[in-house]
């Protein structure tokens, strides 16, 4: 190819791409010459590979037109070469991908796609049909947001999503996706508005947290968008298996929820099955089908009612009866379970083998909790409540997550005092605190220490360093940057988030066979199953929900733990620094619930687990099956879509 031919081809290259490459190359070079020694900024041959990788696209007609398709292809190539850069490493053999390179590579693409997103939305906001669909979908998901405890609409969940299914059935795919996205934004904003409270106490800039909140809400909305996209795609199929795929959609939706509980971005906060938590009779079937089974029932009920509207006669009446049948079936089964003598609230609590547990709720304000000047007063208040307000005969005293607001190894006098308190009270004391381990003395290493969010068990008569449990599930972006182990360059990022390392062990403490869970840990069913299989008979959940302020979040957190107690027949002693603390038996009965920001000590004899549930035995298999179902369902939809296109072309 001659130079003239090359220049002729360049004339047809989209102007946006030329600008993109020029800006990328310029910024890369400027950054290199300004700060060539910055950790993570190794703009040498590997760093330039993404630019070099673009050259073949200059000679490929398919990459030039249409431009969006080119951007997709080029994005894949860029990511591939970023991974290659990471593998090649630097002169010291330490693999990484430069942070600046990542930013300068993806920000132009993000700007382009954001502009496309804005244009797409403007188009739909001008269309009457899209606005009608948006109104219906927002009505549906908006009401669902008010169904999660402590809000009251839970029992209506079997019909609340009917307007959304009408949108999916009656409107084209693009309109359905548009309506679902913005309806889900409303839904998730109502559900997670309390994250705004973190801005009042977090160290990161409030504007950055606000941006993070918007991105989180958009990210969570994409799961509903995926469901809408797939449903609308299947709806348009013209083959015999279409009805089967539509009938399996409720399972597909539950599998999306299951997927959301895995990985570094795991956030299993508000599954649809959690909406019935206000009604003890309605949640007893959790012990058989789990929360994802409830999601399947809810989605199936709404889908069937939406399908019933265009039907006639007896068929229509029969389909409209489905939500009532499901509701009363759950109610009858729940009443049957709770009518058994052993299902009485805190049955057999007085048994000698059961421990007496005291929980100390000091309600330390989050803004004051990490103040060095207030450390002594915070610890003194907590310890005084533990010593003065607990009754004789207490076996376990619980202090909240980070009740010691420091790295406990830096506080030898606090450790000594906790040993003395355990001896004086003749009780085990579990307290939350931070801990650390030095892993490097290299001053240039961004992670010279591993930091842990942990709990420590002090037992009477044992003055060795206390037994430690390290929190296993860390809150994304709050306690840890996702994928920082895969991309060590992320360890250089400091946006005010924690930099904790997750734990790996699931302890079972004797003599009462109980297991500690810290905050977020307690909403993951797999951790509960692991502990039960190790012989645990009681969950002890310590948390600090003071971040959430006076909002629905502490009640949502408590509701999830309660539903897990019913699912696995697993009693819970739950202590929150600022509420809501409560005792929960293996059937979900509450006792001594505290109020938010109430200073109080609650204490009782706590019955241990005596119940084996069906879901405990099959839950792991069922949840893994959901993940496989998600993959198979998506592949099936993709294959049929491709076959449909090929048939149309032929």
Feature-to-residue mapping (PLM):
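Short, Lys/Arg-rich, polar N-terminal cytosolic tail immediately upstream
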Residues: 1-10
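Membrane-embedded alpha-helical bundles of multi-pass enzymes
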Residues: 12, 19-341, 550, 564, ...
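Short, conserved active-site loops that position catalytic residues or coordinate cofactors/metal ions
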Residues: 148-163, 187-194, 361-362, 393-407, ...
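Generic hydrophobic alpha-helical segments
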Residues: 164, 226, 230, 382-386, ...
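Residue-level signal for alpha-helix termini/capping positions
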Residues: 169, 235, 310-313, 387-391, ...
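Second-shell loop/turn segments in exported
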Residues: 216, 372, 405
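Membrane-interface segments at or immediately adjacent to transmembrane helices
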Residues: 278-284, 326-399, 409-419
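Solvent-exposed soluble domains appended to multi-pass membrane proteins
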Residues: 380, 391, 395-650
């Amino acid at each position: 190819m001659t130079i003239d031919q090359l220049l002729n081809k360049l004339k047809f290259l989209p102007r946006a791409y030329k600008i993109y490459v020029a800006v990328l190359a310029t910024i890369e070079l400027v950054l290199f010459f300004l700060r060539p020694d910055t950790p993570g900024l190794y703009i040498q041959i590997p760093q330039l590979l993404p630019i070099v990788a673009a050259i073949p696209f200059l000679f490929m007609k398919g990459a030039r037109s249409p431009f969006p398709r080119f951007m997709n292809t080029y994005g894949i190539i860029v990511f591939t070469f970023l991974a290659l850069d990471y593998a090649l490493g630097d002169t010291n053999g330490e693999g990484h991908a430069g942070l600046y390179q990542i930013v300068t590579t993806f920000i132009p693409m993000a700007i382009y796609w954001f502009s496309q997103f804005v244009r797409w939305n403007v188009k739909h906001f001008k269309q009457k049909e899209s606005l009608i669909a948006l109104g219906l979908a927002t009505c549906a998901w908006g009401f669902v947001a008010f169904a999660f405890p402590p809000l009251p609409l839970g029992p209506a969940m079997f019909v609340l999503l009917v307007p959304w299914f009408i949108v999916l059935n009656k409107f084209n795919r693009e309109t359905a996706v548009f309506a679902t996205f913005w309806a889900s934004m409303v839904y998730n904003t109502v559900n997670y508005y309390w994250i705004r409270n973190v801005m009042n106490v977090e160290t990161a800039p409030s504007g950055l947290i606000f941006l993070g909140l918007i991105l989180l809400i958009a990210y969570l909305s994409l799961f509903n968008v995926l469901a809408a996209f797939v449903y609308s795609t299947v709806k348009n199929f013209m083959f015999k298996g279409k009805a089967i795929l539509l009938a399996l959609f409720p399972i597909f939706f539950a599998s999306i929820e299951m997927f959301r509980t895995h990985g570094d971005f795991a956030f299993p906060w508000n599954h649809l099955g959690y909406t019935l938590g206000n009604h003890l009779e309605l949640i007893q079937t959790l012990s058989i089908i789990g929360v994802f089974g409830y999601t399947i029932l809810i989605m199936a009920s709404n889908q069937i009612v939406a399908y019933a509207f265009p039907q006639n006669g007896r068929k229509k009446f029969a389909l409209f009866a489905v939500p009532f049948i499901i509701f009363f079936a759950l109610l009858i089964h729940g009443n049957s379970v709770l009518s058994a003598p052993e299902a009485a609230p805190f049955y057999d609590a007085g048994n000698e083998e059961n421990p007496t547990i005291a929980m100390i709720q000091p309600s330390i304000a989050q803004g004051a909790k990490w103040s060095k000047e207030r450390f002594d007063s915070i610890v003194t208040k907590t310890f005084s409540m533990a010593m003065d307000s607990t009754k004789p005969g207490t076996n376990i005293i619980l202090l909240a997550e980070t009740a010691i607001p420091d790295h406990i190894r830096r506080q030898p006098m606090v450790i000594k005092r906790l040993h003395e308190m355990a001896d004086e009270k003749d009780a085990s004391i579990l307290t939350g605190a931070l801990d650390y381990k030095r892993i490097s003395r290299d001053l240039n290493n961004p992670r010279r220490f591993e930091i842990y969010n942990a709990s420590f068990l002090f037992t009477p008569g044992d003055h060795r360093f206390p037994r430690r449990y390290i929190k296993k599930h860390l809150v994304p972006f709050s306690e840890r940057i996702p994928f920082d182990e895969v991309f060590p360059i992320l360890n250089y990022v400091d946006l005010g988030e924690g930099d904790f390392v997750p734990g790996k062990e699931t302890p079972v403490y004797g003599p009462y066979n109980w297991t500690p869970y810290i905050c977020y840990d307690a909403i993951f069913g797999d951790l509960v199953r692991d502990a039960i299989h190790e012989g645990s008979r009681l969950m002890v959940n310590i948390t600090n929900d003071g971040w959430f302020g006076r909002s629905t979040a502490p009640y949502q957190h408590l509701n999830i733990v309660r539903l897990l107690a019913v699912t696995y027949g697993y009693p819970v002693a739950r202590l929150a620094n600022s509420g809501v603390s409560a005792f929960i038996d293996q059937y979900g009965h509450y006792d001594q619930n505290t109020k938010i920001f109430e200073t109080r000590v609650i204490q009782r004899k706590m019955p241990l687990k005596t119940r084996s549930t069906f879901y405990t035995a099959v839950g792991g298999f069922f949840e893994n099956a959901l993940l496989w179902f998600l993959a198979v369902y998506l592949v099936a939809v993709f294959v049929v879509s491709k076959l449909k296109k090929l048939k149309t072309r032929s």
